[in-house]
Amino acid sequence: MFMNIKKTSVSLFLMLSAKMFCQQFSLRYCIEKAQQNNTVVKLAGQSLETRQKLFKATQNNGLPKLDLLAGYNYIGEPLRVNLQQVKDGIVEGSANQAVYSANTVYQQVTGNQLSQQVQDIIYQTSKDIISAVYPNYNPEITKQSYFLAGLVVRQPIYLGGKLKSSRKLSEEQLKTGETNLQSSKDITAYNIALQYIQVMYLNSMIEKQKNSLESLQKNEAYADNLLKAEIIPPYQKNWADIARAHGETNLKSLVMEKENALFTLKDLMGISLDEPVEINEKLNESTEIPPFISSQNNADIKLLQSKKAEAETGLDITKSLSRPNLFAIGNVQFFRKDLPVITPPWLVGLELQWTLFDPERRSRNLASESLVKEADLLIEQKQKSVNLATKIAENKLVSLKEQSETFDISRKQAYNTTEMVRKRMENSLSSVKDVNDALQLQYETEKLYYTSLVAYQTALATYFYITGNPENITNYIP
C-alpha cells in the first residue's frame, strides 16, 4: 500500500514539474520575446547604437582641434646660408656703421662732427675693405638632422554650412536607424504571427484527427463484432483496419509538423531550440473584419522617407564643398633645438581654404540631385505598391470570411451525414466502409474549414503588417 502511494506521489510530482517547466506562450508574449532576442532586431539595435554615438560625436564638430605635431627630419643636403643675397645690405650697413662710429668718437674728443668729405672717405674706405673680405660663397651648416615638436590648434570659423549639414546628416541617419529598428521589429512580429497561426492550425487539426481516429477505432471495434457474428465479410473488417491505420499515421504526421513548427517559432524568438515551449491555443473561429485604416504607418515607406532626407542633406553637403573654409590657427613650438634659423616660439593667424577649380564638382552635384529624385520615385513606387496590397488584403479578408462561413456550413452537414450513415450501419442499411468514407469526408471538410481560417488569419496579419500595425493581430488572436 505504501509503495503504491509512493509511486503515485512520484508520478504526480513529475507531471507537475512538466507543467511548471513547459511554458505556455501567448502570441503577444512570443512577439515581445522575439523583439528582444531575434538576431535581425539585435543587429538593427546595434546599428542604431552606432548611429547614436556618431550623432553625439557630430555635436562637437564645431569645437577646436588640438594636435601634437612632432617629427624627426633628415635633410638630404646640408643647409647653406645664402650670403650673396644679403651682401649689399651687409656691406652698406657696415660702412654706415663705421662712419657713425668715427663721427661719434671725433665729436666726443673735439666737440665737432667730421666734415662731410671725411665721412665720405671713411664710408668708401670701409665699403671697399668689407667688400674685399666678404665671402664670395655660401657657407654650409654641417647639422643635417632636426627634431621638432609643438602644439597646433585649429578652430573652424566658417565652413560654408558644412558643419551644420554634417550634424543634420548624422541626425537623419539616426532617424533612419530608429526607423530601421522599428521595421525589423515589425517584420519579426509579422513572421511570429504567421508561425503562431500555423501552430494553432496544427493544434486544431490534431484535435480533429484525434476525434476522427477515435471514431475510426470505434468503427473498427464494431466491425470486429459484426465479423465475429458473421454478419459482414472479412474484407469489410480489413477496410476498417486500414482506415484506422491511416488515421494513426495522419495523427503522427500532424504531431511531427507541430514539433517542427515550434522549432521554427523558437528560432524566430531567439531562444534555445531545447527550451520547453507548449502552445495549446487553437484557431479562433471568429472571422471579425477589423476597421480598415490607411497605410501611412507602413515601415518600408517611413524607411524610404528617411533615406530621402539623408539624400537631401547629402546634396546640401555636396553644394557646401564649393564654399570657402575659414579657420583660426595657433602654433606653439616647445621643442626646436639646433634650428639654423631662429623662429618665434608661437604664432596665431587665420587660414582660408577655397577650392577654386574642381572638375568633379558639377558631376557630384548632379549625382546628389539625381539621388534625391531616385528617392522620390522609390517612395512613389512603394506607396502605390502598399496601396495596392492594402486594397487586395481588404478584399481577401471579405472573401475569406465568406469562404470560411461556407466551409463551416459544409462541415456541419458532414457531421450530420456521418451520424446518419452510422445509424444506417447499426440498422444494417450501410456498410463499415460507408462509415469510414463518411468519417474521411467529415475530416476533409474540417480540414478545408480550418485551412480557410488559417488563410483568413494570415490575411489579417498581413493586412496589419502592410498598414504598419503588425502587433494589432494580438487583439484577434489570444
PLM regions with names:
Residues 20-80, 231, 266-312, 383, ...:
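Bacterial Sec-pathway N-terminal export signals of envelope proteins
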Residues 72-76, 157, 332-336, 354-358, ...:
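Transmembrane beta-strands of outer-membrane beta-barrel pores
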Residues 53-55, 179-297, 396, 400, ...:
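Periplasmic alpha-helical coiled-coil/stalk elements that build and connect Gram-negative outer-membrane
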Residues 31-37, 87-134, 271-328, 473-478:
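Amphipathic alpha-helical coiled-coil scaffold segments and their short linker/junction regions
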Residues 246-271, 412-469:
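Short segments within alpha-helical structural elements
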Residues 72, 151-155, 265, 350-354:
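Residues on the lipid-exposed face of transmembrane beta-strands in outer-membrane beta-barrel proteins
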Residues 67-69, 74-99, 448-478:
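Acidic, low-complexity, intrinsically disordered peripheral segments
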Residues 42-46, 59-60, 157-185, 211, ...:
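Sec/SRP-type N-terminal targeting helices
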